[in-house]
Amino acid sequence: MNRRTLLKTAGAAGMLACLPGKPTAFAAEGKSGGDATSVKTDIYRLKLRHTWTTTMSSSTYRDVLYVHYDHGGISGVGEGAPIVRYKEDAKGAQAAVNSVLPMLDSSDPTQFEKVISEVFARVPGQWAGKAAIDIALMDWMGKKLGIPLYEYFGLDQKDAPVTDFSIGIDTPAITREKVKEAAAFPILKIKVGLDTDEQTIAAVRSVSDKPLRVDANEGWTDREVAARKIDWLSKQNVQFVEQPMPADRIDDLRWLHERASLPLMGDESCRHPADIPKLVGVFDALNFKLDKTGGMTQTYMMIQMARALGFKTMLGCMVSSSCSITAAAHLSPLVDYADLDGNLLIANDPYRGVTVKDGQLILPNRPGLGLLPA
């Protein structure tokens, strides 16, 4: 099912009837189809400050894809961070983007919805590659209009939420050091999902009493064990538990939701617009990531769908540079929670964009993404 068919189907079901109109690119004056277009891709290796470990993987670096879109004298840049969970990598994302370069070269970027829908129709999977194209075109459009992207989406930068800071799975000693390094952040997100979960939380609690958000990354496979862990976490000043069990265990997740003593948030369970209505009664909140959904425009629509169905919402991220994190931050005034710290986990960020002061996201007010070279 393509994007337009899905939107029509959802509308017929009444799911989108109460949503505000999706921003479109038709606000740009004039046509740009006659101007020269150049689209280039490159892979960049991000070096992590600490080894990053979850139940999914462990790494000291992450390769990301950049898409550079130039048209009519205006340049846009987008980033995609491929997700190992979905068997994506940077080379695959680059090949996917390169496969639609002729279409992008001949398209009018002011017809934004048409271009992105065509990309989605032509490229199977490779959501990070799609996100890189989408973000580059959005950056271009904001610069074309001379406005920051939060303004393009009709949002108020003052409504941007506080972001947490993520602590990956590690030894108790290193966990304590990571928590101390995150002293400026009022909320911490703790990765769990192993047999050492209680030691991890104990290590955090030995040096901090801050509110925690706990992410199991599908790591708990026994629902009874998950329920007991959540009950224990409810006494540890935890706000919610993210993706406690595998995404395909919907019946077990629903059972757990009925008994959980903390709110549950879905992440891996929520990838596409059609997933959202199926998760009513399974989760209290949903986590959206540009690399998982395919970019800013799809994420905007999915957040609005989730809100209409009564979910709390969060914008999360992969390990990324300030390009992708700033793109997500421009949408953050829409959501209840933010986990936008991927750029703070790396040592070689090539860009400057969104900044953080005591956990508060501060959006750039320059046109487009508002990026500057590092």
Where are the regions a protein language model picked out?
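C-terminal segment of N-terminal export signals and the immediately downstream linker at the start
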Residues: G21-T55, T60, D70
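Flexible C-terminal active-site loop/helix
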Residues: K8, G14, T37-L46, V64, ...
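Metal-dependent enolase-superfamily TIM-barrel catalytic cores that perform enediolate-based chemistry
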Residues: E151-A260
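N-terminal export signals
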Residues: T5-A27
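Glycine-enriched alpha-helix->loop->beta-strand junction motifs that scaffold or abut catalytic
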Residues: A184-P186, S208-K210, W232-V238, H257-L264, ...
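Catalytic alpha/beta core domains of metabolic enzymes, predominantly
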Residues: D252, C270-L340
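Conserved, mostly hydrophobic/aromatic
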Residues: V67, G73, I133, G146, ...
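Metal- or metallocofactor-binding catalytic centers and their adjacent structured scaffolds
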Residues: G33-T41, Y69-D70, S75-K144
